[in-house]
Amino acid sequence: MSGFATGMLALLVLASPARGAFVTLPSPVPLAEKSLDLLRKANPADAPQWQLVVFGFTRCEDICPRSLENLSRLVKLAREEKVGLGGVFVSVDPDRDTDIVLERYTAPLGENTGYLRLEGEELERFKGQFGVEAVFYNKNKGNEFFYQVDHSSTAFVIDPAGRIRLVFDALEDVGSAEKMLRDNQDFFQ
């Protein structure tokens, strides 16, 4: 993805009002092939054509569980509406979110939903593709386990060509996303 496209996406994500904003991007933002490969590996179930991506961490007590519940709801609705949509939860906290922890965390979400655990520069590059930031509070050499993380609750819908097409708040805009799945079948064809 070009620096301009990344910058515009980051501006869109960061400039969104506190209350939700469901946005269909007029110019879809293409993801790098490496990012697309990672998403495909995270959700190999019958290779859904569309991907719904949310970022978070398993020790989050309020925002992430609701985001994941909404992700699961949308994936199930997409199945009912005959839209091939897979969900991917991307951990922003790989130090505490091991594969075992993430597997347990995402298993109740059902089929067509997986997780992605990346570390270091690979995670930073992946988050950068989406304009997502994560801020760690009180994480230091003396406190490597009991810290907080602040991150975006933005959800991203990636089309079969590997482009970000929809951006919305995973907490505030799930109703708009459900309406889009029910009423705009042509969009997903």
Predicted feature locations:
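Solvent-exposed coil/turn segments that connect beta secondary-structure elements
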Residues: 57-58, 90-95, 120, 160-163, ...
